[in-house]
């Protein structure tokens, strides 16, 4: 049986739709009264694990799942070994650098040296500023990073931005985009090397249906 790690939250519905087109129906996961964290497909050929987006690479890397769907932003933060197979072209949002509207910063190089930048994505933020040769202190937050500039703790934030509504409502605006993040299909490297026909068939089906 194929095991698939599916991300709970914003990516779940489209993830289930992708696998349904490939012949694996996990629609029970979308039922309002569902509390189960494991869902067997109607055809009994696969089961899904419903996990947090950030945990998908963990389950896939350690072999508890053969396949998974996860945001590119998570893959950029993770150092776990997974096979990156396909850009599924949904769940799009930008990883962005943002500052207060009242600041005088219009580009990254305007930020003062050694200023504080708040982010959930510390590895991504550090790599970005290192590439620009801009010395900053990265402050790791797990909640609403917008509060960093609002409270004066940080001059800027690095965070995911979909519509920009949250930034606008909190008096912030983007001054740069680091990258565009979409959902990605990943696999356990050993599962791929074993070259299971059912697994390969699912991957090929998804490749043919993605973006439709």
Swiss-Prot record:
Enzyme class: transferase
Keyword terms of this UniProt record: Amino-acid biosynthesis, ATP-binding, Cytoplasm, Glycosyltransferase, Histidine biosynthesis, Nucleotide-binding, Transferase
GO CC terms, sorted: cytoplasm
PROSITE patterns in alphabetical order: ATP_P_PHORIBOSYLTR (PS01316)
CDD domains: PBP2_HisGs (cd13595)
InterPro entries registered for this protein in UniProt: ATP_PRibTrfase_cat, ATP_PRibTrfase_CS, ATP_PRibTrfase_HisG, ATP_PRibTrfase_HisG_short
Entry's localization field: Cytoplasm
EC number: 2.4.2.17
GO aspect biological process, one term: L-histidine biosynthetic process
Catalytic activity reported: 1-(5-phospho-beta-D-ribosyl)-ATP + diphosphate = 5-phospho-alpha-D-ribose 1-diphosphate + ATP
Keyword Lipoprotein attached: no
Pathway annotation from the record: Amino-acid biosynthesis; L-histidine biosynthesis; L-histidine from 5-phospho-alpha-D-ribose 1-diphosphate: step 1/9
Main location: cytoplasm
GO molecular function ontology, one term from the record: ATP binding
Quaternary data: Heteromultimer composed of HisG and HisZ subunits.
Family designation: Belongs to the ATP phosphoribosyltransferase family. Short subfamily.
Function description: Catalyzes the condensation of ATP and 5-phosphoribose 1-diphosphate to form N'-(5'-phosphoribosyl)-ATP (PR-ATP). Has a crucial role in the pathway because the rate of histidine biosynthesis seems to be controlled primarily by regulation of HisG enzymatic activity.
Comment, domains: Lacks the C-terminal regulatory region which is replaced by HisZ.
Protein name in UniProt: ATP phosphoribosyltransferase
Source species: Prochlorococcus marinus (strain MIT 9515)
């Amino acid at each position: 049986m194929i095991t698939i790690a599916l991300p709970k939250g914003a990516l779940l519905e489209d993830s289930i739709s992708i696998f349904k087109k490939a012949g694996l129906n996990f629609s029970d996961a979308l039922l309002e009264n569902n509390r189960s964290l494991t869902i067997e497909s109607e055809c009994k050929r696969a089961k899904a694990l419903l996990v947090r987006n950030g945990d998908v690479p963990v389950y896939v890397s350690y072999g508890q799942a053969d396949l998974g769907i996860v945001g590119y932003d998570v893959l950029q933060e993770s150092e776990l070994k997974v096979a990156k197979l396909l850009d599924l072209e949904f769940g799009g949002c930008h990883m962005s650098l943002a500052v207060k509207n009242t600041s005088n910063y219009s580009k990254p190089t305007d930020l003062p040296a050694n200023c504080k930048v708040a982010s959930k994505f510390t590895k991504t933020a550090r790599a970005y500023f290192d590439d620009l040769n801009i010395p900053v202190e990265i402050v790791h937050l797990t909640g609403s990073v917008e509060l960093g500039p609002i409270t004066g703790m940080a001059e800027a934030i690095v965070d995911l931005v979909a519509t920009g509504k949250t930034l606008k409502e909190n008096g912030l605006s983007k001054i740069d985009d680091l990258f565009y993040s979409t959902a990605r299909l990943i696999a356990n490297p050993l599962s791929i090397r074993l070259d299971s026909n059912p697994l390969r068939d699912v991957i090929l089906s998804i490749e043919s249906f993605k973006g439709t």
